[in-house]
Swiss-Prot record:
Gene field: glnD
GO biological process: regulation of nitrogen utilization
Protein name as catalogued: Bifunctional uridylyltransferase/uridylyl-removing enzyme
A GO molecular-function descriptor: [protein-PII] uridylyltransferase activity
Organism from which the protein derives: Bordetella avium (strain 197N)
This protein's UniProt keywords: Hydrolase, Magnesium, Multifunctional enzyme, Nucleotidyltransferase, Repeat, Transferase
Positions of region (Uridylyltransferase): 1-318
The reaction(s) this protein catalyses: [protein-PII]-L-tyrosine + UTP = [protein-PII]-uridylyl-L-tyrosine + diphosphate; [protein-PII]-uridylyl-L-tyrosine + H2O = [protein-PII]-L-tyrosine + UMP + H(+)
Length: 858
């Protein structure tokens, strides 16, 4: 066949598609477009078969979504070529010509060629194949063979086996998507709460004879009319979303990728507000719809299961006058119990906690709660009985996180705490949160709960120890509920959240000291992280100032626990062992300071004495130690702890003026990174060259301390983390010692150093490209010295610190200390610097502009 024979078919098809899409843009109704696209392809296939006929006696059938009568703009065209017998040579040739022509038409066929017996074999082996074949539709060829096929598929269908298989398949699919509809980039088709879940319900219902659409399923008694309406609306919303994704990307794309979300928001007419991005508002709508589907999915599947696998109610066991255990699930005794007594809407969750043998709630209970949620109103919230019940839920020894999640899914928690409703499904495009605000909040509570469990004590030894000594753990859960509750409102979310927490504490009758603790935790929940990661913990004044802010040991314990739980609940990328050590160091230092603040001279003396003790253990004579220490000023001893001072001294006391750079490296104490010491003659570009080396090794600098001895030698210390965990840190340490020393030696010799950055580092994540952080640089004089404090915020990228180091070197700015805080794809770094350009307003402004250019990548 001549390919030019296909041109008229292709042109008619493309013109009809364009007209259908233009019509969709006018009315925005998904079903007419999906049906019209299906009709267009049906006609194109029939036209094609006039040129490329089927083998004699064969049938061409649409299967899968196409067989269902729905075709998305860029979906595969799923076809079954059904043969009456095994194909011979001419049959195979005809099929090859037909399939090649389908590709030439631009249809991207997903095709299979089978006999009737092969269809039955494949359907028995694979539930996905069986499901696709169930949704078959005759297109052309032998109608009698199609009838035989339909009869065979119907005859072999076992509703019970089909239900079990589809439920397992759905559970496996949900697991691939982390069992949550709240993914950052959800798949509108496959993610929990998406289109596939709706299709699974209808497949199960159809196999069991309960109907093919929502109206029929409702008439069969599996759904109420309002539930059917809600599911129909959600289905239409997801269908339109999938259509828009295909049209926007011009390919089969079902994921709401970061770079598509802003454009999709425009398509939907969603505008950015003063406090929320348009993309965040779009995603909140998506999450609300997915939550609805997820909840009704549970109810429907239970209802179908009860119809297919009826069990007697003789095993029901009364729990109290309102609830019973039925088949291991919490069941209501009377249908109208929540309408008669709305307080039971909270007590149901308390009963779940108090009866751990219950595997869940029955469909009847879930449905009754769902439909009675409107009974939680202002009067309900003011009821002292309900307030007491809510606190009891938080005070239980088990099931707190499970029930809070269930309360959120059933819309009970958002109705009881209206301020919580605002954050349900609220995405945070801040480059370090990977959960919606409500899911992050529940993750923080989960982390706090783990601190109370002996089986997790080895994961968080200090946190578990601190939690064991803390009274009234539930106060931490209240603080966690409110710590981010004001996100998206504008203003300081910590301050606004503290006011909400104070109001909650007053309304729920918390003791004054407990109310004050909760309010403090919400207001200061970012404090400990900021001090640990941005301030010099070796400075006694920093510790004393933090101790004054936390006031006492109870506040310190609670803040430490909330901080660790908060960071760990933000993103797997944000937490690392180094941050854990910083927080632990700050906790221990502050605990000591709360026992009595120490002045600088006392701390200095104790630090030197401890370093001297360590050096004696290493066999170093006191006179050798003192000779080296005379090269160092007070600032050095305040900037390093005793272990670091002893380590430096042990390697440098005999080479105070070396003829080449000295580099020593050891694994960090917590075992995740490297501690690096550089000792060499000081030069303006030393820090820049060191950063360039780290950048080339894909090392992330966490901490930098820059010191110059009285004789002009640089003694610099770094903590770096590798991009990926290293199997042998000691081998890496030896390699760095050699390579970095050689690089610095070449630089001092005047050699022009090549850019060693490796190619895979020169990339940014998609989210950071779509939602970049506005570069910021703030320069303030350091209140207790002659130096300056430079605070920068920007999107993280390869070579960022190297670029800043270059700006400092070019402007004659000396780096004294750097504290690097990386939060996912966002950096918040602090540099203590000095230099003549910082003393004059004009040159200071020029320096700030150069820093901003470096942050922006210009």
């Amino acid at each position: 066949m001549n390919p030019t024979d296909l041109h008229p078919i292709k042109e008619r098809m493309q013109a009809a598609r364009a007209a259908a899409i233009a019509d969709f843009r006018q009315h925005l109704r998904p079903d007419p477009l999906l049906s019209e696209l299906r009709r267009i392809v049906d006609q194109a296939l029939r036209d094609l078969l006039k040129l490329c006929p089927l083998p004699a006696g064969a049938t061409l059938a649409a299967v899968g979504g196409y067989g269902r009568g729905e075709l998305y703009p860029h979906s595969d065209v799923d076809l079954l070529i059904l043969l009456p017998r095994a194909p011979d040579g001419p049959d195979e040739s005809a099929i090859e010509t037909l399939v090649a022509s389908l590709w030439d038409l631009g249809l991207e066929p997903g095709h299979s060629v089978r006999t009737l017996a092969e269809c039955e074999t494949e359907a028995s082996a694979d539930i996905t194949v069986e499901t696709a074949l169930l949704e078959s539709r005759w297109l052309a060829g032998s109608r009698s063979l199609m009838k035989q096929f339909e009869t065979a598929m119907t005859a072999r269908l076992d509703a019970r086996a089909f239900f079990r298989a589809k439920r397992v398949e759905m559970q496996q699919r949900h697991a691939r998507y982390q069992d949550t509809p709240y993914a950052l980039e959800p798949n509108s088709k496959e993610s929990p709460g998406g289109l596939r879940d709706l299709q699974v319900i209808l497949w199960m219902a159809r196999a069991a004879g309960f109907g093919r659409n929502w109206r029929a399923v409702a008439q069969a008694g599996l759904l109420t009319a309002p539930e059917a309406r809600d599911l129909r609306r959600a289905e239409q919303a997801f269908k339109r979303l999938r259509i828009e994704l295909h049209l926007l990307t011009r390919r089969r794309e079902d994921r709401l990728l970061f770079d598509l979300q802003p454009t999709l928001a425009e398509v939907y007419g969603i505008a950015t507000t003063t406090t929320r991005r348009a993309s965040e508002l779009l995603m909140q709508r998506y999450y609300w719809a997915a939550r609805l589907v997820t909840q009704l999915n549970v109810i429907l599947i239970q209802n179908i299961e009860e119809r297919l696998f009826p069990r007697p109610e003789s095993d029901a066991r009364a729990i109290d006058e309102e609830f019973r255990s039925l088949h291991g699930r919490l069941d209501i005794i009377r249908e109208d119990c929540f309408e008669r007594n709305p307080t039971l809407l909270l007590r149901a969750f308390l009963v779940m906690q108090q009866h751990p043998g219950l595997s869940g709630m029955s469909a009847r209970t879930l449905r009754a709660i769902w439909h009675s949620r409107h009974r939680i109103d202002a009067q309900f919230r003011r009821n002292p009985v309900n307030r007491k019940l809510f606190l009891q839920i938080l005070q239980q020894p088990r099931g707190i996180v499970h029930e809070l999640r269930r309360m959120t899914m059933l819309n009970i928690l958002p109705r009881y705490l209206p301020v919580f409703r605002r954050i349900v499904g609220q995405m945070q495009h801040d480059l370090f949160h990977v959960y919606t605000v409500d899911q992050h909040t529940l993750a923080v509570i989960r982390n706090l709960r783990r601190f109370t469990m002996p089986e997790h004590a080895s994961e968080y030894p200090l946190a578990s120890q601190v939690m064991a000594g803390l009274d009234r753990h539930w106060l931490l859960y209240v603080a966690a509920l409110f710590h981010d509750i004001a996100k998206g409102r504008g203003g300081d979310h910590s301050e606004l959240g503290a006011r909400d927490a104070r109001r909650f504490a007053q309304e729920h009758g918390l003791a004054p000291e407990d109310a004050e603790l909760v309010e403090f935790l919400v207001r200061q929940h970012l404090l400990m992280s900021a001090v640990a990661q941005k301030r010099d913990l070796s400075d006694p004044e920093v510790i004393n100032e933090f101790a004054r802010q936390v006031k006492d040991e109870r506040h310190l314990n609670a803040l430490y626990l909330l901080t660790v739980a908060d960071i760990r609940g933000t993103s797997p990328k944000v937490w690392n062992a180094w941050k854990g050590k910083l927080l632990e160091d700050l906790y221990r230092l502050t605990l000591a300071a709360l026992g009595g603040a120490q002045d600088t001279r006392t701390v200095l003396a104790e630090r030197k004495e401890e370093a001297a003790r360590l050096l004696r253990l290493a066999g170093l004579r006191d006179d050798a130690r003192d000779a080296f220490w005379q090269q160092l000023d007070v600032a050095y001893f305040l900037r390093h702890d005793a272990s670091e001072i002893a380590w430096h001294t042990r390697h440098l006391y005999y080479q105070v003026q070396p003829d080449k750079p000295v580099v020593k490296v050891r694994p960090t104490e917590e075992g995740s990174g490297l501690q690096i010491m550089v000792y060499t003659r000081d030069t303006p570009d030393l820090f820049m060259n060191t950063c360039a080396y780290f950048d080339g090794k894909a090392f992330s600098i966490q901490d930098a301390r820059i010191h110059t001895t009285r004789q002009g030698w640089a003694l610099d210390s770094f903590i770096v983390l590798p991009a990926e965990p290293l199997a042998d840190l000691r081998a890496q340490a030896a390699l760095v010692e050699h390579e970095l020393a050689e690089r610095l030696r070449q630089a001092q010799g005047g050699a022009r150093l090549a850019d060693v950055r490796v190619f895979h580092r020169n990339r940014q994540s998609r989210v950071s490209r779509v939602f970049p952080v506005m570069p910021q640089a703030e320069l303030h004089p350091d209140e207790r010295s002659q130096s300056w404090r430079l605070s920068v915020t920007a999107t993280d990228r390869p070579g960022l610190l190297h670029a800043l180091a270059r700006v400092m070197a070019e402007n004659g700015v000396n780096l004294i200390m750097a504290k690097i805080m990386t939060l996912g794809d966002r950096v918040e770094d602090v540099f203590i610097i000095s230099g003549a350009v910082l003393e004059r307003p004009r040159t200071q402004m020029q320096f700030e502009h150069a820093v901003l250019d470096a942050l922006a990548g210009e």
